[in-house]
Structures are given as structure tokens and as C-alpha cells.
């Protein structure tokens, strides 16, 4: 279902005139519906390990503790690394982590050499100890914050730019979430809609 289709369906169910465009609209009510749908999608995307938002990243290691910004390594809207998915495909070994601050400081207090690497993310950077060998192929899965895909099938985003944008999350949940958010915004009783939504 596209952005335009879900907004039109919502409008029909809510007794609102059906728009012919959403992203090109100047109607404040249509723009509010779009904003509420974006709010719903961004919230729903944080509620678990959605397979539709799972992406694999590959990285060639550098011979330094910091492997660089995680957003540069995992380029499609990085939210977090799925636990126990980083593997050194060159050595065929798992990379342990993420470890916490205390564990990291403990590692830094002793001299270690590979091949059992451990990682953490600090300040938006992927840090590894001991320093890895350059040129190893590492791969991992991460959850993306991008729950929208463009009609081209390759542009991922978390805000709408075109009426033809589609959802990676279930249409029914997005529509249910939009309905209770709209009722709340209008000062109407949304408790029953919210309870039904939360039960899904």
C-alpha cells in the first residue's frame, strides 16, 4: 500500500474528503495526517526486531581501534546491531559484543592479541579490541530506522517524500496507529482504538 492509498483509506473511514495527493497537498488536515502517520511509523519501527527492517552490512577492517562511524559502515539508517551477528568472515570467528563501558575499560587494562575480537559502539564509532588485522571481511545484521521504501525499490527513508512511497511495516498496524493518534490529536476518546492497537 502506498502513502496516498493509506491516507485515502483513512480519510474514507473517518469521513474526511479523500485527497488526490498527500505530499503535494496544501490542506492542513492532509498534512497533519501525513505527520501523524510518520510519527506512528517511526514509533512502530522501534518496537522490536522487524525482519523487514533487518539489513546486512559488510566492513573491511582497519588496523586501528576505531573502525569508523557506524553510520558510515551501516549506511541504511542504522538503529542498532542485532546481538551476536558480527562475524569475521576471514577468520570465521564471531566478534564478541557489544560490551559495556566497564568491560571495555577492563580490556584496555590488559594486553591482548587476536583473534577473539570484542566491540562496542561509543560516540557513534565502532571500536574493536584488540586492534584487528587490516583487510578482514566482517559482516553483521542491523536494524534500520528506515521503514519506508520508495517506488524505485531501492530508496529507504523514515519520512515521506512521494505519494508512491510504500511501507516496510504492516499496513494494518500503521492504519490502526494512525486512527488512534488522529483521535487523540482531535481531543476525542481514543481508548478503545488504542487498546485494540496495543493488543496486536
Please report, for each region that a protein language model flagged, where it lies by residue.
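Glycine-enriched, solvent-exposed interface loops adjoining structured elements
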Residues: 1-200
Amino acid at each position: 500500500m502506498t502513502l496516498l492509498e493509506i491516507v485515502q483509506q483513512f480519510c474514507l473511514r473517518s469521513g474526511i474528503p479523500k485527497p488526490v495527493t498527500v505530499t503535494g497537498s496544501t490542506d492542513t488536515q492532509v498534512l497533519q495526517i501525513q505527520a501523524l502517520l510518520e510519527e506512528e511509523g517511526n514509533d512502530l519501527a522501534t518496537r522490536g526486531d522487524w525482519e523487514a527492517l533487518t539489513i546486512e552490512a559488510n566492513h573491511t577492517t582497519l588496523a586501528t581501534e576505531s573502525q569508523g562511524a557506524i553510520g558510515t559502515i551501516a549506511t541504511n539508517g542504522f538503529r542498532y546491531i542485532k546481538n551476536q551477528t558480527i562475524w569475521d568472515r576471514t577468520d570465521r570467528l564471531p566478534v564478541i559484543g557489544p560490551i559495556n563501558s566497564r568491560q571495555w575499560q577492563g580490556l584496555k587494562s590488559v594486553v591482548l592479541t587476536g583473534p577473539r575480537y570484542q566491540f562496542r559502539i561509543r560516540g557513534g564509532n565502532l571500536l574493536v579490541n584488540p586492534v584487528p588485522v587490516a583487510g578482514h571481511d566482517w559482516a553483521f545484521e542491523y536494524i534500520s530506522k528506515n521503514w519506508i521504501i520508495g517506488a524505485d525499490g531501492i530508496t529507504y527513508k523514515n519520512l515521506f517524500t512521494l505519494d508512491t512511497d510504500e511501507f516496510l511495516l504492516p499496513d494494518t498496524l500503521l492504519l490502526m496507529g494512525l486512527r488512534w493518534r488522529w483521535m487523540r490529536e482531535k481531543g476525542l476518546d481514543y481508548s478503545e482504538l488504542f487498546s485494540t492497537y496495543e493488543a496486536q
